Amino acid sequence: DLTRYSPADFKHETRQLLALSIPMMLGQIATVAIGVVDTAMSGAAGKDDLTAVALGSSVFSTLFITFMGIMAALNPIIAQQHGAGGTHEVGETGRQGVWFGLLLGILGMAVLFALIIPLQNYLDMSAHIKTMFARYLGIVALGLPAALIYRALHAYASSLNKPQPIMWINWAALLLNIPLNYLFIFGAAGTADLAERFQAAPALIAWLRQLPVPALGGVGAGVATTIVFWFGTFALALYLAKSRDLRRFGFTQCFSRPNWRTQKNIATLGWAIGLSYFLEASLFTFIVWLIADLGENHVAAQQIVLSLSSVIYMIPQAIGSAATVRIGYAIGRKQFARARYISGVAIVCGWILGACTLVALLVFRLPLAKIS
């Protein structure tokens, strides 16, 4: 359908797609950067800490990305209702999405807890690494319900063309993650020593030394990440409650019990998306476990590569999410030819960005390796 529209239409739709996808992309990169920061700072604590975080993060990321795909079913549903002018339906679906995220998060948390002992037994590593792995995975599991509720709120806001607040909240979460990582990985005393080295205010240094926070090593990265997940969820929920532009949808103006028919509809649409996300994510995350027997150096190196690939993956993922919203909105307005056209524009944009990413990786591969 690309040939049925003028170049001006293509330019217009590309602008609309990029206006929606770029904030999504930047926000997703900030989220992935939290994992990169965890990796880097855990490595500063020691090779064993980095290995434990790499193994735990690979398990958590695989499940989280899979469930994130299931939650992505909310985007076309809400966008289509928005396009059809269903103000009440949009708010109700948003509330049902929060319930769905909570229930899916509790299920995922139970799965992660159940996997800890079998995966510990599988690892042929030191008892210290096994213990840190178990503690890290158990702690980040507590943040999974918050992370999936956040995905429901994310889908609601982005489907209503409000991706910018999500982007700023994600970057605020990243900035919060850095000092929290210092605090929990190196302890209050270690963080105070760092603050003293950078000539921070004496009052701040004295306050840090009084905090009863021990150095948790790599496990501390899990504590910081869990706190950041809950922070992001409450921050986005507060924005949605206060936003004047979104007030007409009534998202926070009433309480809804779980509607099992709606829950089933979300799951029916989302399981295939989740499966595709799982297959894509596991191509990278499972490699950490396949090479675990080779030792800590190989695991640490793979985690660095995984962090970079995760950042790159956010580019097409953001284009796809933005296209889903645009197409769903067009379908809601019964503009089926326009919906097909938007899908074509999205594919072309994806090809171009993919080619640019490939060239950038080839040109800058050595500097990127040196940074790692």
Task: Name each model feature, range by range.
Residues A127-L153, L308-S310:
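Alpha-helical transmembrane segments of multi-pass membrane proteins
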Residues L50-A110, A147-I166, Q302-R365:
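Small-residue-rich hydrophobic transmembrane alpha-helices
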Residues A33-V36, A44-K47, Q81-A84, S159-L160, ...:
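Helix-loop interface residues and adjacent transmembrane-helix termini in multi-pass membrane transporters
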Residues Y136, I169-L183, A188-L246:
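Hydrophobic alpha-helical transmembrane segments
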Residues L107-G138, G187-A188, A195-Q199, L204-L208, ...:
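Short membrane-interface helical motifs at transmembrane helix boundaries
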Residues A19-D38, I139, Y150, A173, ...:
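Transmembrane helical elements of multi-pass membrane transporters/channels
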Residues D1-A19, F198-R209, G218, T225, ...:
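Interhelical loop/hinge segments that connect adjacent transmembrane helices in multipass membrane
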Residues L17, L50-T51, P163-M167, G218-G222, ...:
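Alpha-helical transmembrane segments and their helix-entry boundary regions
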